[in-house]
Amino acid sequence: MSTSVLTPDHVNALVEAVQRADSALGLFQATQALAAAAHPGGAACLVEVLGFNNPGAAVAAVDGLIAIGEPAVDTILTNIDGYNYGARAWAVRALAGIGDVRGLEVLEDALGNDIGPSVRRAAARGLGQLKLDPLAPSQRRATAERCLQALVEGCRDGEWVVRYSVVVGLESLAPALHPDQAEGPAAQQRLHEALIGLRRNPTEEAPVVQLRAALALQRRGVSHG
């Protein structure tokens, strides 16, 4: 649904439908409708849904927040519930999908400390695809370095699904580490060394991680033995 044809009354009606839902199915369907509108006016309600015990509705809410994009970020950050693990986990997924740098600290913390492998996996992917181009050069470099550091530390994660996503995140981040910048060559070297370490890890339990690291290195034109 195009936001250009939605009036405030339309958005309010969609929000009220979510608030009035009296069954799991009703909540899911109402959330889907609100998410499909992708209107910033529905962001607060979608964030609220993240805290409900309804995974289907939460998935729809995350999709809606990602569709809204940057206008939803402040609402997500302001309303992250530190006492509701489920809501926070879904919020991490939304921030990872949006890719706004305002979510950097949350993604760093999630990759390093979250108890859920699926949340750490989402954070790893998110750290690799933050939208850095609009930033000033110095801020872009500093942000890329923070993403790199978090991902390098994530190489030691105990879950292979997270390590796999770290590989994806590192490969996605690589273009932001421009070799013509002062720190670029050293940062790229760290990134390549992290990928090589994952490729050569003799204790890796999941060969798919090694294969994905090899593919990333091949795409980067880096010899890895």
PLM region spans:
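Short amphipathic alpha-helical segments that mediate assembly, nucleic-acid/protein binding
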Residues: 10-11, 27, 43, 188-191
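HEAT/HEAT-like alpha-solenoid repeats
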Residues: 86, 142-150, 183-196
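Short terminal alpha-helical segments
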Residues: 12-19
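Intrinsic low-complexity, intrinsically disordered segments enriched in polar/basic residues
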Residues: 2-5, 99, 156, 190, ...
